[in-house]
A protein has these predicted regions:
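Long, low-complexity N-terminal extensions
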Residues: 1-279
Length: 279
């Protein structure tokens, strides 16, 4: 009985912070339940979508922002870590703030000690280790947030993804969050169109265009992209991490979505012509 009581005590410690996304307050020690890291990864899948694309010179991050109600402001999903690094987040924003501060501190400590910018891959590895430690301790639950880390160091531009499990991967293009499969499909199709080069030869403007356009299918219902609900940021070999202004984002949306609407109209006209020919 004492052992059973201890198990239930530990289960409460595990589940209390993720109560909003857990079906019931149980832990990995109880039968017919899932590991807490699975619930953390579910939070990532339910978060608003974010996209990252990398070329030989630049990395672009774009994210869909959500508001709790019509009277609430939109939550920012892109954060600057250092001059050469920034992140896009999906999942629990409170957890993302903790990891952002940790990454900022790591970069500052490295700059103070070595008088140079921190290698992006090393920073990502440190964050992944922080993720992984939470999967082995009952005192703290896993971070319910996924990160797209964009950075540029002496080895060139980089785009990484980290997950609550502690795994991390480097990508040429990646999308996370709710309905992100639509963005992944678009990015994969555009990547394959360009053959072996992929996105490597694209300019900054072209990367921004494709990042924004890929987000079109990530919105719920009949919602449309606008400058209020979309954030875009760029970092590159000769460019510090910088957010695009609302005016710049609005212009890109008009260009990207406008072209898409024109293509749709052309396709509809072609279908009508084919119907006339059949008659």
């Amino acid at each position: 009985m004492a052992g059973t009581s201890r198990i239930f005590f530990l289960s409460n410690l595990f589940s209390i912070s993720l109560r909003s996304i857990l079906p019931r307050e149980r832990s990995i020690y109880l039968k017919n339940t899932h590991a807490q890291v699975e619930y953390a990864m579910r939070a990532v899948r339910q978060g608003s979508a974010c996209v990252g694309i990398r070329s030989d010179k630049y990395v672009v991050l774009a994210s869909v922002k959500r508001s709790a109600s019509e009277l609430a402001s939109y939550q920012e999903k892109l954060f600057r870590v250092d001059d050469h690094v920034g992140i896009a987040i999906t999942g629990l924003v409170a957890d993302a703030r903790v990891l952002t501060k940790y990454m900022q501190t790591e970069c500052l400590n490295h700059k103070y000690t070595y008088e140079s910018q921190m290698i992006v891959g090393r920073l990502v590895e440190n964050v992944a280790d922080k993720h992984q430690k939470c999967t082995q301790s009952y005192v703290r639950r896993p971070y319910g947030v996924g990160l797209l880390v964009a950075g540029c160091d002496k080895t060139g531009p980089h785009l990484y993804e980290t997950s609550p499990s502690g795994c991390y991967y480097e990508y040429k293009a990646m999308a996370l969050g709710a309905r992100s499969n639509s963005a992944k499909t678009y990015l994969q199709r555009e990547f394959e169109k360009r053959g072996d080069d992929g996105f490597s030869k694209l300019t900054e403007q072209e990367l921004v265009f494709h990042a924004v356009r890929s987000l079109k299918g990530c919105l719920a219902g009949d919602k449309k992209l606008n400058a209020q609900c979309v954030s875009v940021a760029v970092v590159g070999v000769d460019k510090s991490f910088e957010h695009l202004s609302d005016e710049e984002v609005s212009d890109v949306i008009k260009e990207a979505i406008g072209d898409d609407e024109d293509d749709t109209k052309d396709n509809e006209e072609e279908d009508e012509d084919e119907d006339d020919d059949d008659v």
